Amino acid sequence: MKAKVLLSLILLCGGLAAPVARAGDATPAASPAPAACELPSYLLTSESQLPKVADAVKAGKPLDILVVGSRSTTIPSSESSSYPARMEANLKEKLPASEAVHVSVEIQSKKTAEETASTFVKLMEAKTPTLVIWQTGTVDAIRSIDPDEFRSAVTDGVAALQKAGADVVLMNLQYSPRTETMISAQPFLDNMRVVAQEHDIPLFDRFAIMRQWNDQGQFDLFSPSRGPELAKQVHDCLGRALAQFVIDAAHLEPAQQQN
């Protein structure tokens, strides 16, 4: 049963395996946001800030973003449609043309928060991102990891990333109406919010965002019939939302954004 839940969750957001990088697989430019991507402003705001992102943009330094997550970070055979790529495209569109933006992905397939956090010291020695977006919680919920142990692992992971000099955004679980009665997500959602508050870092509430889209009829996340096409649309909207979330959390002035 647990394996089926994991499979359903991964299929929902579009990835059973990371796509193979191909030369010339360029990220398409950002287009006007479709109506399906609309969200209430409270889901895209945070009282916590991203000072290192702000400093990099103000100084005209490259903005390197590392997304650490599971296979749901990607879409098979369509890397340019995944939410990290769509975030990059939207940041490039919104930030000054002179600002170099690069988003890379570190896949931690089927790993708990504790297992992922244990890799952060070496990972941050090999990379020097301005911002790390850590997508976590789904595997822990599926495996019914003790919520207190989960919170401790997320705390340790955030501390390691901050010690290495990066801003951090936590991204919580994905929402699926097909599996919400099969796993207990709330303890993990609550603990991620607590850790974010304790460390004064932004929490990108992917769970609430996807539930909003489903409840308002913008996306039918219950039906599996549209598969890859639905995944691309959801990823596009997530990428747009993340880009705006990062810009707002960095408190960039209008002069530091494209008009």
Question: Can you name each region flagged by the protein language model?
Answer:
Residues 8-17:
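Bacterial N-terminal signal peptides
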Residues 17-28:
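Signal peptide processing junction and immediate N-terminal pro/mature segment
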Residues 32-105, 122-128:
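Serine-esterase "nucleophile elbow" of acetyl-processing enzymes
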Residues 33-40, 105-111, 133-143, 197:
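Cell-envelope and extracellular/periplasmic
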Residues 53-54, 66-68, 73, 96-98, ...:
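Oxyanion-hole/transition-state-stabilizing segment in secreted/luminal serine hydrolases
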Residues 64-69, 102-107, 130-136, 167-172, ...:
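Structural recognition of the beta-strand scaffold that forms the well-ordered cores
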Residues 135-138, 158-189:
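Active-site segments of SGNH/GDSL-like serine hydrolases
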Residues 175-259:
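Catalytic His-Asp segment of secreted/periplasmic serine-dependent ester chemistry enzymes
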